[in-house]
Structure formats: C-alpha cells, structure tokens
Amino acid sequence: MAILGLGTDIVEISRIQAVVERTGERLARRILSPSEWQHYQQHQQPVRFLAKRFAVKEAAAKAFGTGIRNGLAFNQFEVVNDALGKPTLRLHSRAAELAVELGVKSLHVTLADERRYACATVIIES
C-alpha cells in the first residue's frame, strides 16, 4: 500500500459555536450526513460534535487533494465508528466516485479535542 493523501485540520470550537448561534442549524444541515444529523440532535455537546465532524471533513478534502468543490460536499464524507469506537469514513456520491478513480483501498481517521480545539487527520492509501 502507498499513501495517496494526508490531510489535517484544526478547528476552534468557539468559532463553530458562534456560527451555530448566528445561523442556527444551517451549518450542521450543510455538513452532516443524515445519520450524523441524528447523532448531533441527541448529543450532549452538539457543538463539540459538529466541530469534530467539520475537522474530519476538512482533513478528508485535503487528503483527497480537492478541497470542497467540483461536486464534492461535506456531507459526502460521513464519520462512522466501529464497535470499539474507532472512527473511519464512509464515502457517498462524488466522494465515493473519486475514491474509486484514485484507487483508494483504505481510509484512516484520527480525532482529538480539548477544551478549545478539535483536530483531525485523514490518511488515504492505495
């Protein structure tokens, strides 16, 4: 296997909080998949949840080398967890097509958050 891409992102949680206070659900609706939206609505710390998802999706777009454009959207990158809680990505629509085009075989995700920040790294392998 070879590394095809690496992306990382850090988000100031208070910035996400300010957007949520100003625009309500708009940001969450724009970036979350339907399943993530359900988790967001029930989460004890929804802004922290949203900040972590935003960081992963930004990191994924960087790892793919595309950013969010040319048919890609944040909600096409869905963060899912295995039975032990390990995060990974489920790709939808154009993101899934791009993964096939690039020959992606594995996706690796790591998340971290502290009081003020959330960060994520995504590695894609062939």
From Swiss-Prot:
Keyword presence, Lipid metabolism: yes
GO biological process, one term: fatty acid biosynthetic process
Superkingdom of origin: Bacteria
Compartments reported by the entry: Cytoplasm
Binding site for Mg(2+): D9, E58
Molecular function per GO: holo-[acyl-carrier-protein] synthase activity; magnesium ion binding
Family, per entry: Belongs to the P-Pant transferase superfamily. AcpS family.
Protein name: Holo-[acyl-carrier-protein] synthase
Naturally occurring in which organism (per UniProt): Yersinia pestis
Lineage: Bacteria, Pseudomonadati, Pseudomonadota, Gammaproteobacteria, Enterobacterales
Gene name of the encoded protein: acpS
